[in-house]
Amino acid sequence: MTYPLISHPEANDGERTYPDEQLTDDGSLRLTAHNTVVSEYATRLFRGPETQRRFLCVAASLHDFGKATPQFQAYVRDEYEGPEKEKNHARLGALATWFVLDQRDAPARDKLAATLAVARHHQALPDAAQYTAESLADAFETSNSVLTAQLEAISERWPQKATELLQRSGETDSTWDEFRTWVQSGTVVGELHEVSARRELTGPKATSDKLPRKLYDRTLHYWAAITLADKSHAMAVPESHVFDVETLDRETLEEYISGLRAEPPDDELERALNDERERARRQAIDGVHEWLGGDAQTPPIATLTLPTGLGKTFTGLSAAFEARGILESDGGPTRPIVYALPYTSIIEQTRSIFERPELWGADPTKSALTVHHYLSETVVYRNERESEDVASTDQEEHASFLGEAWRDGTVLTTFVQLFESLVGPSNRQGLKLSALDDGLVILDEPQALPKEWWDGITRLIELLTTEYQTRVIAMTATQPTLLRDVETTSLLDVGREHDKTGCLRCEVGPDYPVRLEPARKETYFENAERVRYRIDESALSFHLSADERYLSHETAAARVVAATAAGEGGSTLAICNTINSSATLTQELCGHDGVTHLGEAIDSVLGANDVDATKQENNVSAIVDAILRRSGLRGVDGELSVPAGTDIVVATLNSRYRPFDRRLLIEIADTLSGSEIPFVLISTQAIEAGVDLSFKRVFRDIAPLDSIVQAGGRCNRSYEWGRNGGQVVVWTLADPDEENPGDPTKSPPAHWVYERGSSDAGIQTHLQLISSILAQFEDEEVPDAEISHHAVNEYFDALREKSLSSTKIRTLIDDAKAGKLARESLIGGYQTVDVLVATTQAERKRLNELTELFTSDDPTDRSTGYKKLEQAAGIRVSLPLNSIEQLPDVSRVDGKERNEDGVQVFRYTGTESLEYDLQTGGLRGKEDTVAGRFTTF
């Protein structure tokens, strides 16, 4: 019997739909059709040079060539009873790829990259040298029984069909018999060893030294395109959903900004600030014309360096929109804009900008905007989402697939999602990489990346800009060492020199009613005198000539109270280096008379209204209003006032709070920080980047200079308290258990973060370096630009001399060791696990339903459980792994034992040996562990 060769059997659920010409009579997907479509898709996804597209076309058209074996054809029809390995198909496809590309005289890099991409199109990429010299070479030996059985079976059953598949790429006229003769000659083994091994007396020895240069870059590129093309067609995702992406537009942003500028400013300072923001935005747009207007095939990285508070988000987006307009002027497909931020904890506020009804009113579950971080529901519904509680399996799977593959016009994500997908990605992580092909990436505050990764990040940026032709815009409030060894173009510098005369893009751009002359980049810093810095004596304790004198949390709390109370008034932000330090400062602050913490009011409102924080439709603003009224801060007339018996209102923010509660806290802080309410927010450094809040004064525990400047960016952000009306105090807090801060015996929290390496790899004498720079300022108050510009530059120059970055990532990339790269992570330090925190009856019911789904014997229930687990992101909190290990009564959400496979997510409903308290710092063990002591954020 001769089967029609198929790639996938008929779908049992009837959900997958293909054109009739791609199907057999029984509804199965034809192998020829699948290989053809995957080849077409992959070459459309790939935006590289035409020569490389032809090589990729060969690989993609042969990716499932191995499915032509009778063994696989029996297996796919549930009729196979032979040896397990003989039904595998990827390596035979890889062998055919090498054969055809060798005939086409493809360079060694392309030939090996395409072969590896096909061999691993269902898996993650391997360490290339070892896999090529050993796994592939052994599999292709003429004595290999699996290969022999597959070759013989095809020759006996349907050699003509194999010939048809082989020639489908259009790059060979060889027949099956010619291919088989070549395989049986054994020459391929020597060819593989030639590019992956050195010859020794004992035989070939795998070595990365023999690999073609930049093999990892090209392999990743081919593999990602084939993987996405293969999966999208296998899942029957509509072609238009893969390629025709919708996006947010610049025109709407221009109209929004025009409307803001039409509103009369409150005073001259606000008018001047608005003009500075708009001047910088227009200047950056002009800079894009210079950046992309040259002949360079690989444009340098564009930098946008502006003081905090000068509108980098809108300026960066405007520049990216303009760049996309230039690149798409030839009528090509829409390029995604990927906007990457440092932390999950701050991404929601940036997301809210895109969701503003008066701006784009974007819905991240629909097309145009995708939000992707580990707590988000990452989906793209191209059509209306079904109204039932659970949409069809097909619709849900497509939406999830499109979301994780970033098949959308605008993507808001984290550095972790972006860079870890380039470093030994899993098969699923690799789906998103084609969105970077000839695309645009905005890096918002890249200096927040771990310093030991900086060398690796520059190598990854090189991969993006040279292999993927990605245009990168790096936005910073400082200019870090990270970018000093790569070619960059300052959008503000070249925008200032841009000649608009004869510029076609300027001619078709918006016609602004008021002309704003461009300015020197330094002028923006000089004009942005929002704060004065004061260096506390304790911040100089690490200087060589200074005595160690730290500040107790008790003394720090007293100073915060004195600064915030009625005499001074206004709002205060106190940033600590660890969660334990922030909890201790909160406790000391609340010990003062007249201090009221908002945690109780938040708890009360959530409980009284039985709020389910897993629901997307929750109205955060309405809940915040109820909290303010419950606490007596907002009266029946809607006005804010201080209730009787209260002198200061306090809130605490860190990563141990649920994401939903963090959203509440940020909106509360946004409401109170600019009011006349004496308000204190105690936070960890999670608030420093991307959180658009403004306080009258900021206290910052000693930190790297760029972190101090980021803290200053939360102070007098829009001149609410006049020019230079904000104050930033830098001090050193003692260990919470230190008995004598004036003569300390314990290391301060800053030591554990910046020298022992809770956030970075640990930098010896780091605090000494920081203190020595701060010690140069003898005046009681230091001007803004002296710290934000000059001191920061000096700091990064000093760091550069220390050679902080590890070369490990770069070396592994250059050696094409994808398997080892997969074990590297941007999130250093301790291991964590996630806990779903239920505080209301509705949430406890939701957790119980989730556990019932995971413990069900019905696979459909478990599938539903995974979807509902994603939807529970709003109540998901990370804890150090060893904290959970010491709390045996905390159970897993899937009901399994801790050492079993399954869903490694835990549950808290209020009865376990955990506690969740909005007043004392969020989720922690009732007897907190040592691990929680030095946790940052």
Curated annotation (Swiss-Prot):
**GO-annotated molecular function:** ATP binding; helicase activity; metal ion binding; nuclease activity
- Names of required cofactors: Mg(2+)
Q: Which UniProt keywords apply?
A: Antiviral defense, ATP-binding, Helicase, Hydrolase, Magnesium, Metal-binding, Nuclease, Nucleotide-binding, Plasmid
Instruction: Tell me the residue numbers annotated for binding Mg(2+).
Output: D64, H122
Q: Give the UniProt record's GO annotations in the biological process aspect.
A: defense response to virus
Disulfide bond annotation, renumbered to this chain: none
Q: What happens when the gene is disrupted?
A: Loss of the 8 Cas genes in this locus (cas1, cas2, cas3, cas4, cas5, cas6, cas7 and cas8b) leads to loss of CRISPR interference against plasmid targeted by this CRISPR locus, i.e. plasmid is not destroyed by CRISPR. Disruption of this single gene also leads to loss of CRISPR interference.
User: Which residue range or ranges hold the HD Cas3-type domain?
Assistant: 24-232
Catalytic class of the enzyme: hydrolase
EC number in record? 3.1.-.-, 3.6.4.-
The UniProt similarity line reads: In the N-terminal section; belongs to the CRISPR-associated nuclease Cas3-HD family.
User: What is this protein's function?
Assistant: CRISPR (clustered regularly interspaced short palindromic repeat), is an adaptive immune system that provides protection against mobile genetic elements (viruses, transposable elements and conjugative plasmids). CRISPR clusters contain sequences complementary to antecedent mobile elements and target invading nucleic acids. CRISPR clusters are transcribed and processed into CRISPR RNA (crRNA). This protein plus Cascade participate in CRISPR interference, the third stage of CRISPR immunity. Plasmid targeted by CRISPR locus P1 transform wild-type cells very poorly.
Miscellaneous note of the record: There are 3 CRISPR RNA loci in this organism and a single cas gene locus. A CRISPR-Cas type I-B system.
Give the protein's recorded name: CRISPR-associated nuclease/helicase Cas3
Q: Which organism is it from?
A: Haloferax volcanii (strain ATCC 29605 / DSM 3757 / JCM 8879 / NBRC 14742 / NCIMB 2012 / VKM B-1768 / DS2) (Halobacterium volcanii)
